[in-house]
């Protein structure tokens, strides 16, 4: 990225597991955006007190699309890792409002404002044989389709598998058990095997940041770029350089 052309990145979902790693990566890497703008319900972590962070805190998520389109300077790239769970949201209908509707509205607002690139953390399986029967896959697929239809200079989708990392708490007992099983399995299988179905949040975050940077530098493989699990690992771990 040329230092003569400073860029700004807006991050939605900066307090979640993947989003918090995206934020820390953006703030600590010397080769990323000169300014990082966030929109969130609560203030994001900024342990280094970086002057590059410009947070907007508003608990009313219905205002976020307007807030996004009003950011100054206008971000070159928007990254959304926004998402919740059915348990946390209080049901599928409420989860749909966040995972689908709000992400769709944010993408539309970004396009209308003139944002060049949009990066979305989706999920593996959105195009699988059973995806039309799974509400979670339908949510993510709908957002992907919207981003593609908006025709950004670059639309970038990451489809990670099971996301590993230290959460504040498991959303339900079954989730905690699943993560424990995967962690235990990791002691017996190679990292390459684990990479086929689960990735660390930090790796996903780094892949998102690197993909955004490549788009801004004109190095993305195409204007519509979908990163499946193997490419996430490639960009976020194997080829990652601070």
UniProtKB/Swiss-Prot annotation:
Q: Which residues form the signal peptide?
A: none
Tell me the compartments it is located in.
Answer: Mitochondrion outer membrane
Q: How does it sit in the membrane?
A: Peripheral membrane protein
InterPro entries named among the record's database cross-references: Epimerase_deHydtase, NAD(P)-bd_dom_sf
Q: Which UniProt keywords apply?
A: Membrane, Mitochondrion, Mitochondrion outer membrane, Transit peptide
List cellular component terms (GO). Answer: cytoplasm; mitochondrial outer membrane
User: Of which family is this protein a member?
Assistant: Belongs to the FMP52 family.
Name of the protein:
Protein fmp-52, mitochondrial
